[in-house]
Each structure stands twice: as structure tokens, then as C-alpha cells.
Design a protein with these regions (language model features):
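Flexible, glycine/threonine- and acidic-rich loop/arm segments that mediate assembly and lattice contacts
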Residues: 1-57, 61, 107, 161-194
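Extended, solvent-exposed, turn-rich assembly/linker loops in the middle of proteins
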Residues: 54-122
Length: 194
């Protein structure tokens, strides 16, 4: 199913008392937890993959285009991406705080429910990018056409512990691929106004 992709698995669990809830209800709760957390888990895996050099079908690590003001960084990514790849497909990945700043000053705009850069590329606001402590300053990434494949959710069974709790674990495997070498840039740290 994930031939040529870099697969990874996301897990979720639900713990409860064995009395008062059926196994089907516990399974539904565990699957609901998985659904709620899987998008951030996929974002985080993509970002960590960029940091550690995991290959997602293209160059392992992003080419660093330099440090710029946030608005200039967006322009550099748009221009650099078209210069390097030229196919006009892909996405720009920014943290929510950086995306909010870009949206507030009109550098990105919402079109049909999604954010778009002036170069026409979709902009994805990533909570995972804001939450990575290893980033000293906001970083912006441009990836080629990106595909995420999700497998079915699997139930790993019910475990009843010695304290009379029941835990149901579910998992789903994902694969991520993009079609060209990623590029990135960083901006000075965003500090809140006093």
C-alpha cells in the first residue's frame, strides 16, 4: 500500500472502567481520539522528517534559502520554488503564529476556505511547526505536490489491567510523499507587542 513512501503509524487509546460502557462504545471513543489527533501527528512527522533528513520521495532535507523578514520570507519561498521547480504545484507550510501575521497584513488571503500565497500556492498553517522547541525562529517551508495516504484504522484489542481498567488501542498507518526538493527560510522571532 505504501510502496516507495515513508510510512509511520499514529496510535490512540481510550481507557475506562469495564462496567457501564460496551466494547463498541470504547472502540468508537478510541477511534474518535485517533481522528482528532491524526492531522497534527501527520504534520509533526512531516516536519520531523525534514529535520532528520527522512526521504519522502525527494531530497531528504530542505534547502535553506536564508533568513528574511516574515513577509520577505514568503516572497523568497514563492520565487525560489518557481525557480527551482517551476511546476506551480505544492504547498507552503508555516506555523499558526506566522500564518496569522501573514494573514493580518494581507500577505496571504483566504480563498474558498483555504489560505493562498500571492504566487497561488496553498498555505498550510501548522500547529506542529509552532510547537517544535527545536525551531529558534519561525521557519517557512515550501514542498512540492504533497500527498498523504491513510490506511484503515486497526483495533489492537482490549487490555484489562490489574486496577480494573479497560484500555482499547487503535492505530492507523500513514504515508507521506512530495514530488520535488523542499526549500525553507527562517524569519526573526515573532515577539508579542507590549
Amino acid at each position: 500500500m505504501f510502496d516507495g513512501w515513508a510510512p509511520f503509524t499514529v496510535y490512540a487509546y481510550y481507557s475506562c472502567s469495564p462496567a457501564g460502557i460496551t466494547e463498541e462504545e470504547a472502540r468508537a471513543a478510541a477511534e474518535g481520539t485517533l481522528t482528532a489527533k491524526q492531522s497534527m501527528a501527520v504534520e509533526l512527522e512531516m516536519l520531523l522528517g525534514l529535520l532528520r533528513g527522512a526521504s519522502y520521495g525527494a531530497q531528504a532535507q530542505a534547502t535553506d534559502l536564508g533568513n528574511f523578514a516574515v513577509v520577505d520570507a514568503l516572497a523568497v519561498l514563492c520565487g525560489g520554488y518557481h525557480q527551482l521547480n517551476g511546476d506551480g504545484q505544492g504547498l507552503i507550510l508555516v506555523g499558526i503564529s506566522t500564518g496569522t501575521l501573514l494573514a493580518t497584513n494581507g500577505s496571504i488571503e483566504r480563498v474558498s476556505g483555504r489560505f493562498v500565497a500571492p504566487c497561488g500556492c496553498p498555505v498550510v498553517l501548522s500547529a506542529a511547526l509552532d510547537n517544535l522547541a527545536s525551531f529558534p525562529a519561525p521557519e517557512l517551508y515550501h514542498l512540492g505536490a504533497t500527498k498523504v495516504m491513510a490506511g484503515p484504522a486497526f483495533d489492537l484489542g482490549v487490555h484489562v489491567s490489574s486496577v480494573n481498567d479497560r484500555t482499547l488501542i487503535v492505530e492507523r498507518t500513514f504515508g507521506v510523499a512530495w514530488t520535488c526538493d523542499p526549500v525553507m527560510t527562517s524569519a526573526p522571532a515573532i515577539t508579542p507587542a507590549v
